[in-house]
């Protein structure tokens, strides 16, 4: 069979063209990273071949010594990176090189700000990979053949990084991939041996595969006399996680993080640990400093890289960490698992549960240590990943208390939107006799801060957590207590401040309730269709009325979220609490006209609904009643 000679020209998609152009210009200030990306890809290709060759040894084609080779030609101004890894067939070339656009691209494009520094970090999270070659090259050639295919099934892909690329079949004896960069006029430094060596040592020394380059001629040695090029390995070529911690520098740890995560920023923290005993494994886990743009997509691939006895098995092994820690990057290398391990086997292996439990505890311990010793760094973590960590109490019962210790909240202590108060700090400031942790949930921070439910708490100097994120109501549904203190939603059920109310206060409340009983019955009749109950409040000191939900009913904020998502919500009516000391209520109590009493009661109910961020079921009726009242007042 001979190679197909036809050259096919194909166009990049519009979105892909924009992204390619943006990448080239946004990353120009840090252009040498292109080599790190290409070497990293070559290493991944070798890992994939090793894995597939476990079941199909013939894929190695009598060439089991996997390596990466870098060549350059100063005169031709070219640089080539060659690996003898898995390679690609024609369809894979089109899928991997011809299409940048993929799931999440539109969201990624929408997040771009025009700020070059910020955008370059975002581009790094998206995964530049191969396309970074166009930062320094005005033309890129890819010659590749998939392991196990015929030499005639080689593929040549060529592009100048503009609107299109060409692809054709070629004869290629060796499996694997060669990328040839035709360097731009002002990028000739990347055809210099010493410059390339320094970049490899800086960014890719940790690559477990040997990276080789032509040996530099010794001083006085004539290059022309050599019959063939001699190569030498220029990196350490040992898996970084397999080295002793004392032998690895911080810079090496940071560069390895960028290799496994394809991130451009340094990690916040990392932990390198060897476990021996019943289970034998090494882990190197990282906490990133920036959240990926698609972090809230719970379906996207996640997890650590899994190796067995230094042999790559899979990317995104999600079985080793729970979903709420999906932002963690790193490597797990086990000596106990089978080389033929699959995702299905991982789900059934009890040893994986033990490793998952230990790794989860390690991450939570890292965060606890950071929060205690480096609060500023933890504040950075919380801003990026706090909302995801809030998923933890619902997913991880065993570590609920540890996760709760890491949560941060806005509270009435500072009255700002900054989520920087821990539950431990709240408990330290609790009033004498206080046995609950109080919180309010609202649609946004201002609604929470100004909630009428807080009035008695402000009067008594009791701190309240101000919760206003979409996940908060759901979080508190799974976080019943912390450090022996129960959580209490100040907008739910009856308010009992326990020892924080004096006996005199309680007796006074009983007397008022008895005196206002006829008024309560009258209002209950007026609002029978809208409310479950009318009662005298202990919460309000300034507002005339507020709405609360039953102790076991769904919170108002959760109800609004579910309704907005089009989900069925169980029917329930709120409770209206009336402040008997407010002039409006006292005036209403004296109203003799029952129709007017009913109208004013409805206005009071609707205003209470608006005050807590709710919406009116019948806005037109509210406006009509209000206009009627205003007209009466003006007359």
Swiss-Prot record:
Q: Which GO terms describe its cellular component?
A: cytoplasm
Localization recorded for this chain is:
Cytoplasm
Q: Does the keyword Cell membrane apply?
A: no
- SMART domains in the cross-refs: HATPase_c
Stretch list, region A? 1-343
Q: Is the keyword Chaperone assigned to this protein?
A: yes
Q: Where is this region: B?
A: 344-560
Instruction: Read off the Pfam families from this record.
Output: HATPase_c_3 (PF13589), HSP90 (PF00183)
Q: Which stretches of sequence are listed as region C? A: 561-635
Question: What top-level branch of life does the organism fall under?
Answer: Bacteria
Example GO molecular function term?
Answer: ATP-dependent protein folding chaperone
Keywords attached to this Swiss-Prot or TrEMBL record, sorted alphabetically, are: ATP-binding, Chaperone, Cytoplasm, Nucleotide-binding, Stress response
Primary location class: cytoplasm
Described by its record, this protein's role is as follows: Molecular chaperone. Has ATPase activity.
Q: Which family does it belong to?
A: Belongs to the heat shock protein 90 family.
The cross-references to NCBIfam families, in alphabetical order and at most eight, read: PRK05218.1
- Assembly and binders: Homodimer.
Q: What is this protein called?
A: Chaperone protein HtpG
